[in-house]
Amino acid sequence: MKASRFFVSTLKDAPADAEVVSHQLMMRAGLIKKLGAGIYSYMPMGLRVLRKIEAIVREEMNRAGAVELTMPVVQPAELWQETGRFDKMGPELLRIQDRHGRDFVVQPTSEEVITDIARQELRSYKQLPKNFYQIQTKFRDERRPRFGLMRGREFIMKDAYSFDRDPAAAKASYLVMEQAYRRIFDRFGLTYRAVAADSGAIGGDLSEEFQVVAATGEDAIVYCPQSDYAANMEKAEALAPSGVRGAATRALNKTSTPDKSTCAEVAQWLGVPLQSTVKSLVMATDEAQAADGSVKSQVWLLLLRGDHDMNQVKVAKLPGLGQGLRFATLDEIEAHFGCQPGYLGPIGLQKPLKIVADRDVALMADWICGANEAHWHLTGVNWGRDLPEPDMVADLRNVVAGDRSPDGKGVLAIERGIEVGHVFYLGTKYSRAMNASFLDENGKPQPLEMGCYGIGITRLPAAAIEQNHDARGIIWPDAIAPFTAVICPIGMERSAAVQAAADKLYADFLAAGIDVLLDDRGERPGAMFADWELIGVPHRVVISERGLKEDQLEYQHRRDQSATKVAAADILAHVKGRMTV
């Protein structure tokens, strides 16, 4: 491709609403153009990146035995009503009506449609296993779209769905796809981690996220440097605390803590470690009663160490806490504690409630908590002496760096990441809801076992940039760069020798299968170099009249700080030697 025929459009400054580096650089490099909140056009330079990502994904999906199809973006609401997701999903699900008043949704995912296809087509065990995938536009009506392609409303995803006869076969399919994902992200040239994850709204009991490591990532990735353990923050666990509870050494005492309503403030006021304080979090559950349709609410008190944060995903999986979990209202708190938040504790309750203690709190002695009276706390609190043992002891918290790894092989570390892929074993959640079954060898109907596998095609360029950039611009890995190499002839319009050398090198690169662009726009060297450094083309060759007189060209990898002189006859081999694809 020659630059004069291509579309190159760069900006000196990023738009004011571009918050993160990837958004700023994609706008400045002319990869995307904003149309509306969370909606972007993929410009020619950006589309080349997407097409390379899609090509790698297709190759590896096909290699893994998946078969491509395409499903509609607009889907009948009836399918979503079968699974209950039409009502359960919030305003992120875009609901529309046609001219006849019929309800439809704009797909954020395609579980319902693929399950509908499967129940019509996969009638016999002889047709299994099957794995279908698509690369398709999706829409999620984000309340606050931001960060460019990182959290847009319209986006492109690769989603795949496997169908098997039993859990063992389904888990085998899951492992095939998990390995395919590792090959995909290895080929992208990105640093990533596959981490255990919660399945969330899609459901299932086996799930992994693929996270691109980046300091600006939205997600916390937990891993153990001494082992293979890795999980996202929702799923991560620490090794259960060992030992026995210490003996009580202090008397229960009510202490004035004027205007000190947080554990940190109380610890500082009393001159004690934050770890000796206990925070009280009041939750409630709402359970619909089948008999009359009324809602039964129950209030729960969760106790965590003052330096720990609640993990709501873990809490929602506890017995009795899974139905309609929410934070209690101020009225509910007042009724049970006789006090407003900031000074709450488990002693002296106005009304009884269930108390759930985190594993660490259950082993504490002489701890500090609210006195259920404004501006007062209790010190020297001890289980058994000052209050009954908790109704339940469980893991309620997010892990912190330095916790012991649950596999016992070291301590946990935390880094930031950007989720770009997710694999789920769904089981029969959707097949049972939609009556998708096959006949086994005995002619008996059995529900299809399903898996679900997604990759954020349009999120990947943003994640790659967050991981690979510098002050000059983007640094693309070879495999997904818009162009692998760029030839920059200086004074091409004035020098027949430069033009001839540029044309020959361009032809040589094309013949060698290198995705090359020849910059024949006639720009000044400084402007030309700045454009390609901003756009992030990995390999740059500069041809000048002075260099040709010495039979040399200049080569510079995008990560290099300076150029290297290379003999003209050796330049092709030199570039190929630096390439990683």
UniProtKB/Swiss-Prot annotation:
Record's catalysed reaction(s): tRNA(Pro) + L-proline + ATP = L-prolyl-tRNA(Pro) + AMP + diphosphate
Main location: cytoplasm
Keywords on record: Aminoacyl-tRNA synthetase, ATP-binding, Cytoplasm, Ligase, Nucleotide-binding, Protein biosynthesis
Pfam family, one: tRNA-synt_2b
Any one GO CC term of the record: cytosol
GO biological process: one example: prolyl-tRNA aminoacylation
Localization terms from the record: Cytoplasm
GO terms of molecular function: aminoacyl-tRNA deacylase activity; ATP binding; proline-tRNA ligase activity
InterPro entries: aa-tRNA-synt_IIb, aa-tRNA-synth_II, aa-tRNA-synth_II/BPL/LPL, Anticodon-bd, Anticodon-bd_dom_sf, Pro-tRNA-ligase_IIa, Pro-tRNA-synth_IIa_bac-type, Pro-tRNA-Synthase_IIa_type1
Enzyme class label: ligase
EC number: 6.1.1.15
Quaternary structure and partners: Homodimer.
Family stated for the protein in its record: Belongs to the class-II aminoacyl-tRNA synthetase family. ProS type 1 subfamily.
Free-text note on domains in this protein's UniProt record: Consists of three domains: the N-terminal catalytic domain, the editing domain and the C-terminal anticodon-binding domain.
Purpose of the protein: Catalyzes the attachment of proline to tRNA(Pro) in a two-step reaction: proline is first activated by ATP to form Pro-AMP and then transferred to the acceptor end of tRNA(Pro). As ProRS can inadvertently accommodate and process non-cognate amino acids such as alanine and cysteine, to avoid such errors it has two additional distinct editing activities against alanine. One activity is designated as 'pretransfer' editing and involves the tRNA(Pro)-independent hydrolysis of activated Ala-AMP.
UniProt name for this protein: Proline--tRNA ligase
Organism: Verminephrobacter eiseniae (strain EF01-2)
Organism lineage string: Bacteria, Pseudomonadati, Pseudomonadota, Betaproteobacteria, Burkholderiales
